[in-house]
Amino acid sequence: MTETMTLYWRPRCPYSARLRARLRFARVPFDAVNIWEDGEAAAIVRSVNNGDELVPTVRIGDRFLSNPSFREVREALSSSS
């Protein structure tokens, strides 16, 4: 897992909280970006989700995953290395 991963999230989103917790528990390194505090990040999320601020959105290299499961993230990380 050498590819940098960014997790776009927002407060009070249970899906974001669950994915963040699973990633931390598994010790998967990632950068977490709160889209309510970072307008550029919010614009990125909208651009890959048809104008919606759908979170969690995960970026691995040039690939984006919208509301992925933990398994989907692990598979994407494995295939990117």
Predicted region positions:
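Short amphipathic alpha-helix with an adjacent loop that forms part of the alpha/beta core around
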Residues: 45-49, 76-77
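Short secondary-structure transition/capping segments
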Residues: 1, 42-46
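Local sequence-structure signature of Cys/Sec-based thiol-disulfide redox active-site neighborhoods
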Residues: 1-29
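Non-catalytic, surface beta->alpha helical segment in thiol-disulfide oxidoreductase systems
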Residues: 60-81
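Structural micro-motif
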Residues: 49-57
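Alpha-helical elements of the RecA-like P-loop NTPase motor core of helicases
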Residues: 17, 21, 43, 75
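Glycine-/small-residue-rich active-site loops that bind phosphorylated ligands and cofactors
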Residues: 14, 37, 65
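Thiol-based oxidoreductase modules, predominantly thioredoxin-like and allied folds used
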Residues: 29-42, 52
